[in-house]
């Protein structure tokens, strides 16, 4: 029996992307910090194969992957029918049970989760959800589209170009020649649609460039090439939409040539400095560009805007926007918000309020 006094919040986690493991940990932060006096919490895991299971797993079981084997898991779907406005559960006894859902937290990273696909389903269902909408989620996920929009908005960015699989397969040497001529060495090679530094390589010569392209194509059908920026990485948390509010940036002290997936989530060698080691004027400049980029790409709810600050020139250049940033214990977004005076439980409350307010404005 659902409580009429509490909001029913569904936390989605897992997914079919290469960032499945990170999502499980991020979702655990929400599960552990949602106020049970205010919310009825349901957790729904999406396996790597794409099965949706309603589970009573703890955050520890979610993180280590053992949640999938729990005997109480029930297959479920989000109904696109607005009359249902929620979940459909398929019980072990063969019954079909409908649950009203007030808001969804899509704690999903990468493709088939952070790219607007799940958001479109929730829009069809008329269910409020935390974070950016369909358009912003899709364009921020595609680095080539995002870069083009940054250029159009006048937000500084390093030199770049992109190529699709068919272009590469038909003329690999021509694609390499174009990238070398425009960008010089070294070149960062990235899948257009991936996050958490998955599939990214720093190429120093032609052989490495070809290997990097092959790796990127394992993760996406489109490849982005970017000129190397000799600088350090800083990140801003942005929240809201009317107006967007950016925090003071924090700084990543990476343990490798660039901020790798392992640095972020496995080997623990990266460090975070808040605020970033910049002048007050430069801190404000980063904040300004973060709010500009967030607004230009139609972001709502929350996002993390990542920048480079070039050594020597001190020039600020945007790298990318993450529309559902990590919420792991080492993730920058919650650390930045806490530094501004908003601890995780209060942050979650605010994000839910923003989700409900957006739906109210859209649909009345």
What do the PLM-derived regions correspond to, one by one?
Residues 201-288, 311-317:
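Phosphate-binding site of ATP-dependent enzymes
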Residues 41, 128-129, 157, 187, ...:
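Hydrophobic beta-strand scaffold residues
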Residues 144-153:
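Structured adenosyl-cofactor binding patch, chiefly the S-adenosyl-L-methionine
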Residues 2-7, 13-16, 36, 279-364:
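ATP-dependent carboxylate activation and anion-phosphoryl transfer catalytic cores
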């Amino acid at each position: 029996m659902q409580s009429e006094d509490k909001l029913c919040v569904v936390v989605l986690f897992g997914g079919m992307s290469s960032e499945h493991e990170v999502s499980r940990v991020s979702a655990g932060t929400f599960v552990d910090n949602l106020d049970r006096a205010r919310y009825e919490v349901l957790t729904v895991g999406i396996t790597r194969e794409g099965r949706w299971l309603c589970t009573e797993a703890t955050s520890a079981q979610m993180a280590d992957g053992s949640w999938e084997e729990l005997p109480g898991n029930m297959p479920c779907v989000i109904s696109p029918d607005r009359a249902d406005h929620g979940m459909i559960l398929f019980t072990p006894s063969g019954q079909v049970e409908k649950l009203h859902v007030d808001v969804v937290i899509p704690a999903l990273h990468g493709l088939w989760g952070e790219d607007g696909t799940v958001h479109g389903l929730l829009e069809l269902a008329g269910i409020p959800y935390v974070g950016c909408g369909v358009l912003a989620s899709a364009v921020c996920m595609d680095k080539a589209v995002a870069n083009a929009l940054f250029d159009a908005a006048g937000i500084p960015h390093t030199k770049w170009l992109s190529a699709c699989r068919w272009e590469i397969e038909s003329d690999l040497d021509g694609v390499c020649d174009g990238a070398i001529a425009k960008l010089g060495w070294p070149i960062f090679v990235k899948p257009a649609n991936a996050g958490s530094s998955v599939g990214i390589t720093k190429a120093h010569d032609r052989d490495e460039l070809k290997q990097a392209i092959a790796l990127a194509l394992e993760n996406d059908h489109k490849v982005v090439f970017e000129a190397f920026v000799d600088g350090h990485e800083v990140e801003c948390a942005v929240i809201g939409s009317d107006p967007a509010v950016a925090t003071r940036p924090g700084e990543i002290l990476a343990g490798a040539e660039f901020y790798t997936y392992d640095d972020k989530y496995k080997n623990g060698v990266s460090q975070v400095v808040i605020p970033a080691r910049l002048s007050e004027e430069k801190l404000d400049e980063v904040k300004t560009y973060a709010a500009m980029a967030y607004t230009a790409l139609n972001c709502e709810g929350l996002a993390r805007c990542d920048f480079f600050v070039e050594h020597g020139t001190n020039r600020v250049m945007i790298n990318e926007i993450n529309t559902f940033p990590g919420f792991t214990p080492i993730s920058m977004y919650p650390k930045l918000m806490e530094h501004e005076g908003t601890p995780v439980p209060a942050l979650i409350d605010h994000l839910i309020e923003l989700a409900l307010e957006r739906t109210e404005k859209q649909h009345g």
